[in-house]
Curated annotation (Swiss-Prot):
Its cofactor is a divalent metal cation. Homotrimer. Belongs to the IspF family. This is 2-C-methyl-D-erythritol 2,4-cyclodiphosphate synthase. It comes from Neisseria meningitidis serogroup B (strain ATCC BAA-335 / MC58). The gene is ispF. It holds the Pfam family YgbB.
Length: 160
């Protein structure tokens, strides 16, 4: 049995009026928010998928289905912590998390330190082990037209 595993996660949500924009557990001032059953935090959903995938535990939808009433407007930090408990129960510990958020607007740089701190706290790892990169799509495609925000994540796990 291998003692290290890597997981990859991805999520995208449509931007819409009348919703809060939450990324990495941080409410970001913006005229639109992400549409989804939960708080639609695409960054935390990608991290959650990466963790579950690395541990061989499926994906976020199999653990927290968007058809279940108990997850309506759920805080994605709560979902991340619950998923990570399942990962730890299988004997795995997160080593590091590397993510990319693609959003034409708003600028994410001012919010990245708090996003990193939230993920580090939720996983019980040092903030130096969490990286978040904000990118635009150079005005190309649906992301460039500000129709949505996309997030990608990679997670390294080690056997406890």
């Amino acid at each position: 049995m291998t003692n290290i595993r890597i997981g990859q996660g991805y999520d995208v949500h449509q931007l819409t009026e009348g919703r809060k924009l939450i990324l990495g557990g941080v409410e970001i001032p913006f005229e639109k928010g992400l549409l989804g059953h939960s708080d639609a935090d695409a960054l935390l959903h990608a991290v959650t998928d990466a963790l579950l995938g690395a541990a061989g535990l499926g994906d976020i939808g199999s653990h927290f289905p968007d058809t279940a009433a108990e997850f309506k407007d759920a805080d994605s930090r709560v979902l991340l912590r619950a998923a990570y408990q399942s990962v730890q129960a299988q004997g795995w510990q997160a080593v590091n998390v590397d993510t990319t958020v693609i959003a034409q607007k708003p600028k994410l740089a001012p919010h990245i330190p708090q996003m990193r701190a939230n993920i580090a706290a939720d996983l019980g790892i040092d903030i130096s082990c969490v990286n978040i990169k904000g990118k635009t799509n150079e005005k190309l495609g649906y992301l460039g037209r500000m129709e949505g925000i996309e997030a990608q994540a990679a997670v390294l796990l080690v056997r406890i």
